[in-house]
Structure formats: C-alpha cells, structure tokens
Amino acid sequence: MTITSILPMSVEKSIEKFINQNVEYQKLREKFFPNALLREDVLGLLDRFCTVVYFPIENEDNNGFHITDVPFAGGTPHNFVYINTAQTMEKQVFTAAHELGHIWNVDQFVLKDLGLENTTERCEMIINRFAAVLLIPEGIFRNSVDSVLDDYLNPDGRITVINLLKLVVVLMNQFFVPMKAIVLRLAELNYISLENANDLLGNSHLDKVKIEELVQSLIADFGYVKFQVPSMKKWIDGLSEKLDIAEAQHLVPQEKIDHIRKEFDLARPPVLATEMTDTLQFTSQEGAKDNDN
C-alpha cells in the first residue's frame, strides 16, 4: 500500500514529551531495560502492562492486536495483547511497541497536546510513529546513519538502490525492526523522499518481490541470523500454573484443560520429590559492590 503522507516532526516531539513524562516507564527502563535501544526488550516491557498471548497463526497477515477492558479477576478491566509468533521476530518487536502505544493511549495525548482532529487514520499513524520513536530514537538513529553513510554514498552524494538497501539492512540489524520501519524512519527524518521510500517498499516502479528477495539475500550475506525467522512461541505468563490450580480444584472441565495444554505444548507438571522443598542458605549481596569501594 502506497504511503501518501508522513506526520510532521511536531508529532514526534509530542511523543517524545509523552515518553519523557512517563515516570513508570522511565523507572522500568532504568531498572530492567537499561540498554540505549529496546530491541527485543520491548516484549518484556509490554508484558508489564498487559497479558500477552504469544501464539503462531501461519498464513495470516495480522501481526497482532489489542483487546481492552476485558473483565479480569474481581471484575477489574484488563488489557490483552495478541502477538502472532508465526511472523518474524523483528515484526513481533514492532507489533509489541505499537500495541504498547495503544495501551498507553499515546494517540490521545498527542491529539490533545497538538489540538489535532481525532480520526482513526491519524490515530494509527501516531501509534506507528510512537513505535518508531520508542525503538528507533532520532539521536541514535542519526548517529548510526552518519557513521556508515560514507561507505554507501557515491562521490556525487547520491546513492544506488542496492547500496541504500544495504544501509537499510545494516540499520535493521542495529535496531531489530522490520525493513518498512527503517525505510519510513529515513523518510521521517528527511534522509530520503517519500517517493523514494515508496520505491524501496515496492509501491512504485520497483518490483516488490525482487526487493524482498534482495533484502533476504543481504541479510544472509551479512550474517544477521536472527532476521526473517519466526519464533513460533506459544506462551501466556502464568498459564501453566493456573491450569494446574484449575485441574487440582476441578474449576474447569478436564477436556478443556487438556486441550489448552496441547495447544500451548505444555507438559503435565512432574511429581516433585520431597527434598525439593528443603531450604538452603542464600546470602544477599545487596550493597556488597558499594562496600568494596
């Protein structure tokens, strides 16, 4: 689908303001996700704000979706996110960031902050831009592009399609996001035109299939083995333990429990030997590093 417009930088600055004002997120980044780039850590971040259902559905274009305000324990509303793990890992990463934007209502913050009209298309564009800002922050991205750009530019300052695709693949590897995210980021930050972005995405005169084949070949040539690989993960946090409780207390029909275990490849819990409950000495080393200094 042809990209017809890109949100202005004022939207990006509003998104950055939201991120900087999100105290809970900043504390989580500092404690659990200290790396400058989130990459796959965004999946762990998403887990902290909702229940994530990881399950593969092959031959399905939908990368994932968000269900809000589902009645949970005690009747409290709860968020669920589905991630299609038959998609490649880099697509799962971007999907997780996108759905996190929905949970945080980033679009509503930006609309109010900038006084923009609330439309479905604009909201989705804002959420996609949020995912880009979260995973591909401007400062780091510019430094990354500038550090390798001379390797790919012609002497006249122009760049061939093949070299631009090489640059895209290198950036995909650094930020662990899909090709489309990098191409759009290059356009959002004015490295390339929207017309050229559509060219690379196969939305104009360039053959989309041939571009995708070339990108896959470059990924293999560069040794980026984590790309273009689906995880096929089947997991819901705490599902196994909850099934054990439901089975022990006869809360759910046994055939339903067996069916869920089969679908999620969950083995029956082993019978633990009594010595597994023995206690061992474990000495906390909190503050030990500071004391050494």
Task: Name each model feature, range by range.
Residues 1-293:
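Active-site hotspot residues in diverse enzymes, especially metal/ion-binding acidic/histidine motifs
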